Amino acid sequence: MSTSTQNIPWYRHLNRAQWRAFSAAWLGYLLDGFDFVLIALVLTEVQGEFGLTTVQAASLISAAFISRWFGGLMLGAMGDRYGRRLAMVTSIILFSMGTLACGFAPGYTTMFIARLVIGMGMAGEYGSSATYVIESWPKHLRNKASGFLISGFSVGAVVAAQVYSLVVPVWGWRALFFIGILPIIFALWLRKNIPEAEDWKEKHEGKAPVRTMVDILYRGEHRVVNVLMTIAAATALWFCFAGDLQNAAIVAVLGLLCAVIFISFMVQSSGKRWPTGVMLMIVVLFAFLYSWPIQALLPTYLKTELAYDPHTVAQVLFFSGFGAAVGCCVGGFLGDWLGTRKAYVCSLLASQVLIIPVFAIGGANVWVLGLLLFFQQMLGQGISGILPKLIGGYFDTDQRAAGLGFTYNVGALGGALAPILGALIAQRLDLGTALGSLSFSLTFVVILLIGLDMPSRVQRWLRPEALRMHDAIDGKPFSGAVPFGGDKSAFVKTKS
């Protein structure tokens, strides 16, 4: 960038079409967040009406994560083949219909299935919206694009909490899900009023359709085997999270089966770059394991252990959600300043100072608890706003939506496991201690995985001939691509 360009405020580097693209995707992500967190807000009410155990109730949160890997794969491939815009609209319609079905659910099984539909739509929205905005903005602003976009999910959670305090005490929990149908109107507007992402148009204009992940897996020579493996993975996940299996050994075997299937899909679709894809799934898995016990079970903790009424719960969740939203935006600035990986590590380290006090002070002072949650979520959860940018940089444009969608949403199974882990540990400890200890310990795993750039490092160890040296989104070097003490003369002298 020239000196004169650097002196221009960052927001003036964006034209009206780029701002419109961002605004549309951000609103879509807000609605996604609104619909997705509704179940966490009314979990105790649903549990009471359906007569569920705590673990069964937590599995309703997990259900949306179980289907996400397939939604990310299918809708991501749609985005790679037909454009990011169509995938985004389809995703919004899917999760809206699933939310409406939750409102009519007569029992546990029906609601579980509706949550599976929500998960598919949410996965598609994540992959398509993230790639859409990132590919529409200039390269030097793409951490901001990612962080600002993901803040919409947290804002949606804040809005949902406020609507919960107004609607549920008067009309009951089902009314909250009926409101979730409104995003369909927005989806129809999107289809007619937003342009396609610039990177995608440049890559595909006048060219034959790309061979997507769906083509490789379900139209290639191994299509029959892959269909059978897809059914096997879906069945195994169903039994793990909804089958009420009491035998830990069986659950472990089913989990291992799913891992083998997902790695097989990654090897087939990514070729020699499969080590990068597998490591990205592991990064996301632990990112969800450290963050989602709090995201999913904080409302339950506030209502049961702290005995807060709906109005006070909404107050505290406002601080939490608003902190995460602010953190996404702050993370965007940090990422463009320090580099994506360095910003991630610094923010998570700072968040560790706050996680224990959040669950140690009790509920006597709502304002102190709210402020602690605000800053903890700003630093710990908000930095995940640049995770799409981090993941997307490992994939080329023609595979980015499916690559991001699949790796992220397979890893997001950590979000399915997280609330159940929290609920199980809470059977021996109090819920607050369970949530705090899980988050504190697992955050360090994410710090190591991202700080050491393990996707590039493992790629270098296993298949060095396919090693990518630079981020495909912003061109910055991958620190894990060169051994410690190795020759880094090939790197561009820029922040990493």
Swiss-Prot record:
Any one Pfam family match given in the protein's UniProt record, by short name: MFS_1
Matching entries from InterPro entries are given as: MFS, MFS_dom, MFS_trans_sf, SA_transporter
Record field: transmembrane: 22-42, 58-78, 86-106, 116-136, 148-168, 170-190, 224-244, 247-267, 278-298, 313-333, 353-375, 406-426, 431-451
Q: How the protein sits in the membrane?
A: Multi-pass membrane protein
Q: Which reaction does it catalyse?
A: N-acetylneuraminate(in) + H(+)(in) = N-acetylneuraminate(out) + H(+)(out)
Q: Gene Ontology terms, cellular component aspect?
A: plasma membrane
Main subcellular location: membrane
MF terms (GO), sorted A to Z: carboxylic acid transmembrane transporter activity; sialic acid:proton symporter activity
Q: Where is the protein found, in the record's own terms? A: Cell inner membrane
UniProt KW keywords: Cell inner membrane, Cell membrane, Membrane, Sugar transport, Transmembrane, Transmembrane helix, Transport
Gene3D superfamilies from the UniProt entry: MFS general substrate transporter like domains
HAMAP family assigned to the protein according to its UniProt record, in alphabetical order:
MFS_NanT
Hey, which family's this protein in? Belongs to the major facilitator superfamily. Sialate:H(+) symporter (SHS) (TC 2.A.1.12) family.
Q: What does this protein do?
A: Catalyzes the proton-dependent transport of sialic acid.
Instruction: State the name under which the record lists this protein.
Output: Sialic acid transporter NanT
Taxonomic lineage is: Bacteria, Pseudomonadati, Pseudomonadota, Gammaproteobacteria, Enterobacterales
